[in-house]
Regions:
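Active-site and adjacent loop segments of nucleotide-processing enzymes
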Residues: 7-26, 31-204
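Short cationic amphipathic helices and targeting signals
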Residues: 1-5
C-alpha cells in the first residue's frame, strides 16, 4: 500500500512499474482510492475507532472464518472453552468496532474456561494480530460507525439493528453425528441482502 499526496499520483503511477521491476518485483496496480476506509491490505480495512485506526478483517466473511475450529470439540466443555478463547481474541481485535465487537462478546457470554497456549491457536494470524492488545470495554463512537459504513457499506442504523440482536444472543450447542453444531441467523435489512449472515458452526 502506498499512501501519497493526490498531486503526486500521476508521477508515481508513471514510474512505479519501472521502479518495482528494478527491485525484482512483478505486480498489478489496483485503482487508487481516496479515503482510508477504502484501503485493502491483507483482507482487512482501516476503521477509525476511539482508540485510533484499527485494521478490521474482511466483514462479514470473518464471522464465517471465526466459526470454524481446528481443535476437536467433542464435548460441551470443549465448545465453551473454544467460544471463550475465540471471543476474547476477537474482543481484543475489535474493541470499539461496530457489529464485530458485539459478535465476539456474544461468544464470550456463551463460553467458559480456556484451552490455554495450544500450538494451533498460538500460530494463527488472529493470535498474532491480538498479541499485546487488551479487551477492555471501549465505547463505539459515532465516528467509528461512519468509518465502518465507509469501509463495509453498513449504515449506522443497520449496525445498531444487528447489534441489538447480538447483544441479546447466547449460543446454544448440540452434539450431533458431525460434531457440535450451532445454527444462527441474523435479521439483515433488504439493502444488505448480499451480506446476509447465515452460518453454521461445524467441528469435525
Amino acid at each position: 500500500v502506498l499512501i501519497i499526496e493526490k498531486a503526486d499520483l500521476e508521477l508515481v503511477l508513471k514510474h512505479l512499474h519501472e521502479w518495482m521491476k528494478l527491485s525484482g518485483y512483478w505486480f498489478v496496480v489496483e485503482d487508487p482510492v481516496y479515503s482510508m476506509e477504502k484501503i485493502i491490505f491483507c483482507q482487512a480495512k482501516p476503521v477509525k475507532t476511539s482508540r485510533g485506526w484499527v485494521m478490521v478483517r474482511d466483514f462479514p466473511l470473518t464471522l464465517a472464518k471465526d466459526s470454524i475450529s481446528l481443535l476437536p470439540l467433542k464435548t460441551e466443555v470443549h465448545w465453551k472453552k473454544w467460544a471463550n478463547d475465540v471471543g476474547r481474541c476477537g474482543i481484543a481485535l475489535t474493541a470499539g468496532v461496530p457489529v464485530l465487537y458485539s459478535w465476539y462478546k456474544a461468544l464470550v457470554r456463551s463460553g467458559d474456561g480456556s484451552f490455554g497456549a495450544h500450538p494451533w491457536s498460538s500460530r494463527t494470524g488472529a493470535s498474532y494480530l491480538a498479541s499485546g492488545l487488551s479487551g477492555e470495554e471501549v465505547a463505539i463512537t459515532d465516528e467509528a460507525r461512519v468509518s465502518f459504513w465507509e469501509a463495509f457499506g453498513w449504515s449506522p442504523y443497520y449496525q445498531r439493528l444487528v447489534e441489538a440482536e447480538l447483544n441479546g444472543l447466547t449460543h446454544d450447542f448440540s452434539l450431533g453425528r458431525e460434531g457440535i453444531q450451532q445454527h444462527y441467523n441474523l435479521i439483515i435489512p433488504k439493502e444488505n441482502a448480499k451480506h446476509f449472515i447465515s452460518n453454521q458452526l461445524y467441528n469435525y
